[in-house]
């Protein structure tokens, strides 16, 4: 039986409901048909009477299957029960067949693997020992689930005879991640893991119909001995293969819209992970493009900058109201966009050529369309003055916003977002909370994309941002910048820990340090704080102020550090090439942030109102 979220987890729910005649096998049971019917279970250690494999022999088979299935990177956290996999991976690494990264903290390891999968487009694996080590992967697995990222969890476990006995570091690991994974299998000690690994990789990469890519758990039980035999040794080292060189951001072209299409005042919304097809569609149909930064569509002649401040000027009572909405990707950043999509009088359609992991069918109001031809019929083509009106309003809004920001020599969140966007190149990761929203507000769309943009918008948590950025930088093999707030930075400070023998990424970490969480001041909590009715509760419970010396923290981890407080100094720092790891700390004051946003909104409203009244 598949629960309400079966569209997302597909092979998981039934996997852990074995039929009476499943025979607790772990070989033939791992075919897609067997998994779907609920017969992939485990129990005895020698399924079908097959000879029991040694721990290292089984691990070598698992590694071969992983590499054959496209895994190029494995992040390893140390542990004894996972030793057979670690030794087998070391052998493959010595042959130049896989890249290994070592991280002490499993939570950081999970997000590093997530970043590797994001930047390479290939499944990336993370290996842990048994016990709490596996549980530390839950945040990365949850993000990978909702963001459709092929993350392979390799969790080592005790053999069946030690489970439930109080054996050290032993808990119930099979299906630990529940509905967060596309596939979970418990592979008994001594059994051949090949087909289970193959099925897991198929599920992770979206090979099964109606199942989006996403994380899987391969729970591998090992029995002593866990180390190689005395006669074993590493292969002769071969030249290490580098699997990826960062590519330039993409630009697509579509044929111009047919003149037979109906003219409609349609807008194109490009949410997270929309891709360049959104820009191409807007351009081909002469429609305004309202693109979030992580859409990788925020460029081109149709892109409108501070669009979220313009939507109220094109509402139902406006001279030129929005008639339809075409959505690419997932919108996550602003309430005005959510309000537009919720309007019953404005039909909307979602371009969805493949299964996605961020919503359940029937739970959203947009009409899902699989083909661009159907989308074109829905959207129509823009009237002659529709795009021009939006571009004029957008230009006026951008100018007004820039004037307000120019009045403040000290750096502010929006001015930092504007500068980071302007100077971005290579790869850019935008942290959750205010950072990505500052870029969305103030980042000027460019004629062509300058960087490939990433963000953890699956669940939009602040977890693991530094580690994700490290994985992105190492996977893409080009300079990478990450913009994040101080709370997000401190939440993953352990992600700065990279051993002396490990490869160092080209990573610039821009930290907007306003000594706490500023986003709550821009929400309703800011009004509560201003009213003073709850004393210092808002500051203490939501802003969570701190006095961390980021320079000292950087020095402790061996990471370069510089501090700036003005927009001019930040622009100079961002113009420098990225060499190794460095932190640019931007020291700001959040006490007047709510007032700054009010001034921006007022200035933009006046400027746009003047343009539209002509």
In which residue ranges do the predicted regions lie?
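Phosphate/pyrophosphate-binding active-site segments
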Residues: 15-16, 45-53, 329, 338-436, ...
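N-terminal cofactor/phosphate-binding cores enriched in small/glycine residues
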Residues: 52-127, 132-142, 442
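Active-site diphosphate/adenylate-binding microenvironment
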Residues: 59-63, 80-86, 389-477
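Structural signature of the thiamine diphosphate
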Residues: 70-73, 118-128, 134-136, 143-149, ...
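Structural motif
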Residues: 77-79, 189, 219-222, 269-274, ...
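Glycine-rich, anion-gripping cofactor-binding loops and their flanking helix/strand elements
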Residues: 114, 118, 129-130, 136, ...
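Thiamine diphosphate
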Residues: 143, 154, 161-174, 438-614
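Glycine-rich, acidic loop regions that bind phosphate or pyrophosphate groups
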Residues: 144, 155-200, 291-398, 499, ...
């Amino acid at each position: 039986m598949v629960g309400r979220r079966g569209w997302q987890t597909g092979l998981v729910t039934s996997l852990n409901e074995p039929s009476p005649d499943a025979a607790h096998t772990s070989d033939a049971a791992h075919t897609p048909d067997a998994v779907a019917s609920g017969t992939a279970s485990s129990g005895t250690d020698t399924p079908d009477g097959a000879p029991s494999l040694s721990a290292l022999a089984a691990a070598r088979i698992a590694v071969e299957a992983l590499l054959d299935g496209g895994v190029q990177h494995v992040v390893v956290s140390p542990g004894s029960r996972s030793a057979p996999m670690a030794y087998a991976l070391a052998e493959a690494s010595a042959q130049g067949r896989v890249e290994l990264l070592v991280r002490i903290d499993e939570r950081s390891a999970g997000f590093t693997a997530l970043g590797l999968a994001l930047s390479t487009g290939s499944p990336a694996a993370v290996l842990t020992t048994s016990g709490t080590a596996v549980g530390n992967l839950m945040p990365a697995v949850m993000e990978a689930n909702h963001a459709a990222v092929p993350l392979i969890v390799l969790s080592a476990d005790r053999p069946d005879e030690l489970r439930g006995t109080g054996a050290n570091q032993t808990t119930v690991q099979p299906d630990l991640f529940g509905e967060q994974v596309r596939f979970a299998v418990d592979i008994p000690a001594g059994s051949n893991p090949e087909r289970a690994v193959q099925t897991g990789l198929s599920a992770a990469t979206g090979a099964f119909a109606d199942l989006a890519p996403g994380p899987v758990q391969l729970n591998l039980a090992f029995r002593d001995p866990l180390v190689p035999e005395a006669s074993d040794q590493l292969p002769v080292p071969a030249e290490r293969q580098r699997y990826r060189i960062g590519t330039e951001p993409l630009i697509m072209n579509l044929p111009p819209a047919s003149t037979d299409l109906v003219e409609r005042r349609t807008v194109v919304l490009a949410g997270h992970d929309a891709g360049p097809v959104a820009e191409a569609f807007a351009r081909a149909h002469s429609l305004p493009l309202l693109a979030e930064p992580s859409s990788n569509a925020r460029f081109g002649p149709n892109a409108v900058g501070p669009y979220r401040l313009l939507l109220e000027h094109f509402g139902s009572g406006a001279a030129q109201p929005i008639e339809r909405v075409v959505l690419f990707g997932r919108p996550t950043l602003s309430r005005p966009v959510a309000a537009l999509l919720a309007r019953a009088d404005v039909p909307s359609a979602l371009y969805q050529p493949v299964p996605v992991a961020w919503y359940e069918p029937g739970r959203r109001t947009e009409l899902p369309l699989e083909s661009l031809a159907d989308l074109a019929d829905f959207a129509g083509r823009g009237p002659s003055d529709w795009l021009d009106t939006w571009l004029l309003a957008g230009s006026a809004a951008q100018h007004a916003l820039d004037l307000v920001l120019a009045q403040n020599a000290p750096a502010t969140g929006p001015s930092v977002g504007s500068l980071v966007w302007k100077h971005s190149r290579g790869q850019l990761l935008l942290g959750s909370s205010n950072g990505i929203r500052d870029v969305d507000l103030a980042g000027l769309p460019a004629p062509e994309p300058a960087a490939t943009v990433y963000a953890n918008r699956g669940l939009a948590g602040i977890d693991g941002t530094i580690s994700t950025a490290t994985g992105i930088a190492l996977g893409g093999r080009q300079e990478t910048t990450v913009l994040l707030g101080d709370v997000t930075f401190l939440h993953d400070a352990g992600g700065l820990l990279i051993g002396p023998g490990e490869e160092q990424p080209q990573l610039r970490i821009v930290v907007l340090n306003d000594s706490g969480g500023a986003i709550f001041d821009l929400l309703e909590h800011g009004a509560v704080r201003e009213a003073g009715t709850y004393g210092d509760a808002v500051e203490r419970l939501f802003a969570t102020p701190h006095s961390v010396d980021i320079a000292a923290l950087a020095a402790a981890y061996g990471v370069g550090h510089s501090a700036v407080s003005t927009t001019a100094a930040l622009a100079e720092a961002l113009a420098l090439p990225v060499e190794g790891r460095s932190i640019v700390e931007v020291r700001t004051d959040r006490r007047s942030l709510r007032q700054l946003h009010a001034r921006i909104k007022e200035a933009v409203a006046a400027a746009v109102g003047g343009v539209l009244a002509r």
